[in-house]
Amino acid sequence: MDSSRKYKRCGFGAALFVANIFFSLLSLHCISGAHGHQQRMKESVMGSEPPVCATKCRNCKPCLPYLFDIRGAHDDDDDSEPYYPVKWICRCRDRVFEP
C-alpha cells in the first residue's frame, strides 16, 4: 500500500515537472515572437530617420543630412498626390554624398 502512494506522488511530481517544462518553453516562444515583431516594426520604419553624415562627406564640413524630394523625376507633377518619393542624402555646401 505504501508503494502505491509513492508511485502516485512520483506521478504527480512528474506531471508537475512536465507541465513546468511545457509552460517554460511556451513562454520562451512568446518572448521570441515578441522580439521578432519588434524587429519587423524596426525594419518597417527604416529610412525615416536622417542618416549620420559626419564621416560621409570626406573632408567637407559641415556635412548635414538633407531630405531630397524627387517629385520632379516623375511625369505627373501633381501636388495633390498624397505620396511622393523622397531620399535622404548627405550635403556639404554645393556637394551631395550618399549616406
UniProtKB/Swiss-Prot annotation:
InterPro entries: EPFL. It comes from the Eukaryota. One of its GO terms (cellular component) is extracellular region. Residues 1-35 form the signal peptide. One of its GO terms (biological process) is guard cell differentiation. Its main location: secreted. Pfam families: EPF (PF17181). It is found in: Secreted. Disulfide bonds join C53-C90, C57-C63, C60-C92. Keywords: Developmental protein, Disulfide bond, Secreted, Signal. Belongs to the plant cysteine rich small secretory peptide family. Epidermal patterning factor subfamily. Controls stomatal patterning. This is EPIDERMAL PATTERNING FACTOR-like protein 8. It comes from Arabidopsis thaliana. The gene is EPFL8.
